[in-house]
């Protein structure tokens, strides 16, 4: 009998635990159905908020003062602020914006009885910037020359937006022409009456700052310079040409590196092409030693053959000794001449093509080039035979 109430308590506790488990299971199922079920999503609730700042209120007295100040001062918000006294300039400006929009709206479509007729003041002109960006000028030719400050001369650094080429050109102008100034303010000393002994066109010429004034300086210097002699190098020959008089003619100071000799009757394979001197002309005419075609050489030599034969007997002392076979001795040449022009004898003509041979061609060179040279010589020899 004593064990019966204990068992009853145990059974009651077990039943209560089962009921709790069932309730929690049912709640979990319902939560899953709400969260993961079909397309039925719970709407998000916005967080509640409260407006703490209240909108400023304008009384009738303040509005009347505002309208009076608006008629007196226009859009001068600081003066309107002083006139109203109870509102700041920012509040007055926002109130004026709303008031102007209301006046414009009622003037166009609504009744004008609610709002007093008032003339809206025009907007104030925009302020010019205190430190504007440097602007590009339209015409560079209209600009006057820039004045050089004494501090800039000491430091040699331009203070304005100009290229270093322009500043260097200004310095060169100042150094080249001490008696002339670019502008009346260009020198640090007080302006003095300076006169130059230049020509009339130079006095009328106005110096303006250009992008590249170095070309102008070069033109001025070249016009002032005296005529000078120029040396031209043509095919290994140096020729002196003077600017005065005939620019194309050669002066008596022209010289050639090859010796000057009259043309003998016969030329060997080792004889160089000489230079002919004509007694009627005062100047020397140098033949440019360039390879010519065979036909041109033949035509020239046939025309001058008779004159050469007549001169050959009288000029024997100047040339080398002639052998019985008709060959002349080899004349001495300068050591600076590494290359020489040679005549290759042929059967049909007195002269053939000019060959240029190098003194070091026997010791230097690559094998295939030598073979090619031999092949070309054989082909040309066959051509001479056919001619």
UniProtKB/Swiss-Prot annotation:
One of its GO terms (cellular component) is nucleus. Residues 124-134 have a biased composition (Basic residues). Keywords: Biological rhythms, DNA-binding, Nucleus, Transcription, Transcription regulation. Residues 1-44, 105-200, 306-334, 350-387 are annotated as: Disordered. It is found in: Nucleus. Residues 324-333 have a biased composition (Basic and acidic residues). GO terms for biological process: auxin-activated signaling pathway; circadian rhythm; regulation of auxin biosynthetic process; regulation of DNA-templated transcription. Its main location: nucleus. Induction: Circadian-regulation. Peak of transcript abundance near subjective dawn. Down-regulated and strongly decreased amplitude of circadian oscillation upon cold treatment. The keyword Acetylation does not apply. CDD domains: SANT (cd00167). PROSITE patterns: HTH_MYB. One of its GO terms (molecular function) is DNA binding. This is Protein REVEILLE 1. It comes from Arabidopsis thaliana (Mouse-ear cress).
